[in-house]
Each structure stands twice: as C-alpha cells, then as structure tokens.
A protein has these predicted regions:
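Non-heme di-metal
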Residues: 2-238
Length: 238
C-alpha cells in the first residue's frame, strides 16, 4: 500500500507516512486470511459472531485511548494537536452517534438471538491488542498516535470491504452494516489525521516506525486468533 499523505501543512509529513508504510509491510490487514475469507463470503456466522465479541473490546477502549492522548497533549502544551485528536474522539462518541452503539448493532446482526455481545469475554489476542494501545499511550503521544495511524491509514478500505461482504454474502444491511459504512466514509475523508498530527509534533520517523509496527503486529495476531478458530477446512491457505 502506498500512503499518500496530505503535505499542505507539515514538511515532515512524507517521512512520517513512509515510516507508517514500512511498519505495515506484511501487515496490511486486508491481506490476512481471515479478512480474505470475509471478502469471499467464506466465514460462517459463528465466526462473525466470535469476531464481533472480540473486536468490541477494542472499540470500547478506543475512546479511552483517545481521551488519554488528548489529556497528555494538553499537559505537554500541544493544544492544536490535542484539538485534532479531540475532534476524532467527538466523532467516535457521537457522529452520527456513538460508534460503540453502531458496532453493537453489527454484533446483534451476526449473533444468535438473545446473546449479549457486550458481556462476552474477549480472547487473549484481543486483550493483548487493547494492552498494546494502552502501553503505547503510556509511552507518550507520539507512540500512541503512531499506533492509531497504523490502523487509521487502512481503516476506510477495510470498513468498505467488510460492509460489501456483509451485504453480498450475508444479507446484512442497514443497521447491521452501518458501523462499517460510517467508517468507510469518515476514514476516507480524514484517514490521514494521525499522520498529520505526528508531523505537527515533529515526531521522529524511527520512533513512529517502531510504535506503529507494535500496533500492526498486535492487529495481525488478533486476526490470527480469529482465523485459528475457523472450522476444519474453512481457513484460507497462504
């Protein structure tokens, strides 16, 4: 994937984008066997249900991550960048409504009637994914924003692919696909915000690369766990 950054504001943006791209080598999520099977309609509903139960833990943690980054940036005197992150937090909490609420409708669409996705216990890789982001937040805004950029730069394409797969293969539309529709449109509009924020902080591309790689590896391991639970004979080879 070639990340084409917005270069109108910060001269360091291309170097940051290149660092993110290098971190994502062999870790572009749409190439993972689990997402390839989603695109091809080869996932069973039970796999989508399990995925939703695990992914929810990250979606629930994301506002906490963003809030912590905003607080740290304000403490460090980086109010302009803090405002940029705050806008994304505001989107997460209420544009067009809480994204967690939108996600729960997706989860309900792929889960057995009467199941409570929000009460489900996440698996080890999902817990590790959240822990990775939490650890990077504690390291500081550059590390946290690098982790966010590792996902945000590919989020629009991932969301669009998921929404298309849900409609085409599983007959899930409307409320069931809205979470992915919102992210496909919203992230296409400003998916490079984290790269711009890193450039505004004059982040060291080497530091960005290391933190983004940690996040990318955690996402890949999460999908490995999803794929490992596939029924015998269902997993994608290669």
């Amino acid at each position: 994937m070639l990340i084409t950054p917005n270069t109108t504001h910060e001269p360091r943006t291309p170097a940051i984008a290149e660092a993110i791209e290098e971190a994502l080598e062999q870790r572009m999520l749409l190439t993972h066997p689990f997402y390839r099977r989603w695109e091809a309609g080869e996932l069973q509903l039970g796999e989508l249900d399990s995925y939703a139960r695990n992914y929810r833990s990250f979606e629930a943690a994301l506002p906490v991550v963003l809030s912590a980054v905003v607080q740290r940036l304000n403490t460090d005197g980086s109010a302009e960048v803090a405002n940029r992150v705050q806008r994304n937090l505001d989107d997460e909490l209420g544009r067009p409504e809480s994204h967690l609420a939108l996600f729960d409708r997706f989860a309900a669409a792929v889960s057995p009637p009467g199941s409570a996705t929000e009460a489900a216990e996440a698996g080890p890789a999902a817990d590790a994914l959240v822990a990775t982001y939490t650890d990077l937040v504690e390291e500081g805004p550059v590390a946290a924003l690098s982790a966010l950029a590792a996902y945000e730069t590919q989020a629009s394409a991932i969301a669009a692919s998921k929404a298309e797969g849900l409609r085409r293969w599983y007959g899930i539309d409307g409320a069931g696909a809205a979470f992915w529709d919102v992210h496909a449109a919203m992230d296409a509009d400003h998916g490079d915000w984290a790269i711009d924020a890193l450039a505004s902080l004059d982040a060291d591309p080497a530091v960005v690369r290391v933190a983004a790689k940690r996040a990318a590896d955690a996402w890949w391991t999460f999908l490995d766990e999803c794929e490992a639970a596939a029924p015998v004979g269902a997993s994608c080879a290669g």
